[in-house]
């Protein structure tokens, strides 16, 4: 099976849609995607992903399934609530509700637990942002999606009784 992970076009975050450039990118993508034998289309519920896929759906006469777990990963934290996290974002003006992946590289390098398979789950950043629960929600959603196409998780691997050559497209973030 082939998974196509497609990021939305150039975003206009203020209106949760696309810029003029993003609309053009989505149109060009649709020109290519109409020739790809996609078995199923899936899309994030957010406007910029939906605006991106709309061109492909119109071009192909197809529909997409909206999957809530494919929204942009919403883990945020307030670094002001922790002495250890105050310097994670530098001197940026916005000091509350920061997304976890915007931390400075220096912070990541000084906290190697963030880069380990299980260590990140108990890190201060993860616990303050609710990241483990959000991650588990996404992992569960992906497992369910893959199972619906015949691939079931067994530990760290996916197992299938009968493989397939299906292509599925996920329009997300």
Residue ranges: model-predicted function:
Residues 1-4:
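Extreme N-terminal starter segment of soluble prokaryotic enzymes
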Residues 18-33:
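Short catalytic helix/loop segments, enriched in acidic residues and glycine
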Residues 31-118:
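Phosphate-coordination/substrate-recognition cap region in phosphate-metabolizing enzymes
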Residues 121-137:
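Surface-exposed cleft-lining segments at the edges of enzyme active sites
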């Amino acid at each position: 099976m082939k998974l196509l992970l497609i990021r939305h076009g150039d975003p206009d975050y203020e209106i949760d849609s696309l810029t003029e450039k993003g609309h053009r990118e989505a149109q060009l993508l649709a020109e290519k995607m109409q020739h790809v034998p996609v078995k199923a289309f899936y899309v994030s519920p957010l406007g910029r992903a939906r605006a991106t896929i709309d061109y492909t759906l119109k071009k192909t006469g197809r529909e997409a399934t909206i999957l809530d777990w494919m929204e942009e990963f919403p883990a945020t934290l307030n670094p002001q609530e922790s002495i250890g996290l105050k310097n994670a974002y530098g001197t940026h003006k916005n000091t509350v509700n920061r997304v976890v992946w915007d931390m400075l590289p220096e912070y990541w390098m000084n906290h190697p637990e963030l880069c380990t398979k299980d260590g990140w789950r108990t890190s201060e950043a993860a616990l303050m942002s609710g990241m483990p629960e959000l991650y588990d929600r996404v992992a569960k959603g992906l497992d369910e999606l893959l199972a619906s196409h015949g691939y079931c998780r067994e530990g760290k691997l996916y197992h299938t009784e009968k493989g397939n050559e299906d292509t599925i497209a996920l329009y997300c973030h």
